[in-house]
Every structure is written in structure tokens, then in C-alpha cells.
Amino acid sequence: MNGPLERIPAYVREFERYVPSRPDAALMRQYGVSRLVRLNNNENALGPPPSAREAVAAFDPARAAVYPSGDAYDLRHALAARFGKSPEQFLVGNGSCEVIASVIRALCAPGDAIVTADRTFAVYEWVARFSGIASRLVPLKNLALDPAAMHAAVTEGVRVVFVCNPNNPTGSWWNRAVLESFLRALDGRAMVVLDEAYREFVDDPDFPDGMEIMESHDNVLVFRTFSKMYGLAGFRVGYLCGSLEATDIIRRTQIAYSVNVLGQVAATAALADDAGHIAATRRMVADAKAFLGRECDALGLEYVCGQGNFAMVRTPVSDTLLYRRFMRQGIMVRTMTGFRFPNWIRVSLAPEAAMQAFATALRSALDAK
């Protein structure tokens, strides 16, 4: 038989699909628990800012019958006002994942390549692979992106370099001097995506602001999201900012109307009054980091706790085995084998009650070995 499915490209056929976790209710039934503490997806346990909550509560359900703005008009104008740029420099997508896909579709063709780290946000590599684009994966150095090695990997055919800053899952980051040096050495030979999904968690004055960096480097694109600090992961709103020319090119590959109306409303409202929310979230994360550090030190466990609302813990047993032990206690963490960190787990940093529950479950899970 010579059907159409036999002509599927090998790079699609060979790609292993992502399998998401089951809904919370199904997981609770599976593991026999009455509650589930989610510490697996770097979500903001404080939820959205009050302004976003109020906007969603005031939403008229009758508007669900009407298509949203096809290009997130109001949100793009709010972003432009916040960052002092043109609304046309912003492209809003159904989460950063859609924006990643749009960038790769617009800038790469089969036979081209991207460069990124080997242990970073996996979606860059995934989208490239199932699009027939090669991924040149550069090993981390001391758990951080290696600028010299990444620069060396940018040879003929490389169109995009993805720099996750801070890096997920290690929390490491390039300061302004390192980033500027990298961009000067690259000299515009490829587009550089600064994925700043966790930028709002960082208050170090030496952290480079991509929105400023791009003003002097036309080949820089900046990604940010409302999923993390702003607590709107369920609405799926991410965005890109670039030069007018670059954003116009990328917009041609983006599906219109992909961002739902509630997401647009909530994100626009969140921007309008976010200072208190950001400060409260940073305090919560700082307290959780200190708590986790004390617990790991007491247990003699290696841990990595950089910038962002997450930490990694090295475990003396298989991360998948530990995951099941955690789940039987109603605690959900992220196994890290898929990030090329076998026998590590990643833990979202959350309020005290959740961290206490994690610590209790951790001790119980380790005692079971």
C-alpha cells in the first residue's frame, strides 16, 4: 500500500510526541490521594494579580460568541506603552511555544540549523526537529550556557540562536557584559532570541534587560510570557518583541486569532497594576529558596537554586521512582531525565505550606529507599 501516510517526512515520523500529564482529578484517583500540590510546572502559586482577577470576573460571558482581536491589539498597545516601543514591534501568541514556532517557520528552511544549549527549555529543539531543522546543542559549562562554545557553533546555515536567560532549568544567567560580548562576537550572523520567561523574578542590577539590548542590536528578539510571574499559564499568552522589520516577517507565519479573548483581557489588566504582585511573588520565592536550601543541606542533597521560581535537587534514587513516591503523597514534581539531568527533580518555589508538604514528602520518599 502506498498511502499518503507513507510519505510523511522522516523528521516527523521519528519525532516522539510530548505526552502531557493527566488532569489533576485523574491523577488523584490514580494515586489514591485527596489533594495534589503542583510543584512541577513553575507556576506562580499566588495566582494572577488582583487587576487580572477583577478583569476576568467582570468579563461578560456573551462576549464568548465574538472572535477576539486577531492580533491582540489592546495588549500590544499596552506592551508598547510599558516598554516605550511601537505596538508593531510586538507579536502575541498562544503562549511562548507558539511564538517559538513562528520564529522558526519564518527564519529557517529545511537544511538550516538553530543553536541552543543541550539542557535548556526543550521546545526550541522540539520545534526545530519536527520542522526538519537541525539543532546544534551546546553543552552547559558549570550549569550555565557557555557563550564561547555557543558562538563557535554558529557556522554556515545557522539562522537562530536561542538563549534562555535565566536558563530553565538551572536558573543560571548571563550578565550584561557576557551578553554584549557574545552579541559583538556574533556580529549579526544569526538572529538571537533572548527568552526572558523568568525575567520578572530577577532583581539583580547586573541582569541585562533584553528590551534595552535590542535597541542596539537589530538581530535580537525578546520573548516574555504571562504564564510565570503573572500567573496566567492557563490562558496561554506569550509575546515577542523585535525590530519592526523582523517582527513583520515573523508575523506572516503566525496564525491570526490564536490568543483567546480572556487571555488578552487578563494580560492587559495584569500589566496595568503589577508592582505589588511582583514584589509579593519575589518575597515568596526568596522565602521558599531559603527553606529549600535548609532542607537540602540537612539531608545532604545537592541542589541548584538560581534565578527564577524553581530549583533543582539531585536525588540518590531514580527521578521517575521518586516522582511516583511523591505522587502517592499528593506532591507533584518534575522529573529531569527529559532535560538530560537524570536523577534530578525540579521543584516550583511556593508558599510555606506547600514547601513544608514537599519537605515532608521528600524525607518520606528518601526513607523508602
Where are these regions (language model features)?
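PLP-dependent aminotransferase-like
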Residues: 106-163
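PLP-dependent enzyme catalytic core of the Aspartate aminotransferase-like
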Residues: 177, 325-329, 334, 338-369
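Conserved PLP-binding catalytic core of the aspartate aminotransferase-like
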Residues: 285-286, 295-329, 345
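Short acidic capping loops at alpha-helix termini that bridge into adjacent secondary structure
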Residues: 86-90, 111-113, 189, 196, ...
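PLP-dependent aminotransferase class I/II
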Residues: 47-49, 219-297, 301-304
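Active-site pre-lysine segment of PLP-dependent enzymes
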Residues: 147-157, 169-192, 196-229, 245
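N-terminal small-domain helix-loop-helix segment of the aminotransferase-like
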Residues: 2-97, 102, 369
